Amino acid sequence: MRISSVLRLVSLALMLAIAGCASKPSRINNVCAVFEQNSSWMNNWKRDVRQASSRHGIPPHVMMATIRMESGFDSKARPRGKKFLGIFPGKKLSTAYGYSQALDGTWLQYQRETGRHSARRTSFSDAADFVGWYHAKSVRTLGLAPHDTYNLYLAYYSGHGGYARGNWRSNRTIQAYARKTADMANSYAGQMQSCW
């Protein structure tokens, strides 16, 4: 009798864990659809973004646009590496990983400064909090406005030191990414009026 009770509990725990796993949303240009596709009791992205926004003072549409640009809402996203002889995986170019594409060192700094030592880059809740934390640091250290998606994204991509040095000024590609992220944030802000 005890073994069957244990098996039932294990089965229930596995079902809850699987139900809580997020799959990549299919309609990533519509933030309301993204929230709708991830709105279970255990995995509620709207709740996660709302909490991170409240904690760090960064608007939710800015955080969602950043995550959209960085990973396309793919929990296991990684930058593409170079290929050796065109087919074999080569050297990794970056340690960026997960929803937020946070680098190893920056993620460790986040864990130390926030006390969230068990935070994972593949957890949407943790990634949303990371993006809010990083943007809030940009607001404090670089004097950026919390709604200035363009410059917040430049600082996110370049790092605080790179942004302060102006490394992005000669990089048209990163400027285009920042413009695209700002446009996405504006679109998300409009969409959120009907689902926030």
Name what the model sees in each region.
Residues 1-10:
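Bacterial N-terminal signal peptides that target proteins for export
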Residues 22-196:
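Catalytic glycan-binding domains that act on GlcNAc-containing polysaccharides
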Residues 17-20:
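C-terminal motif of bacterial Sec signal peptides marking the signal peptidase cleavage site
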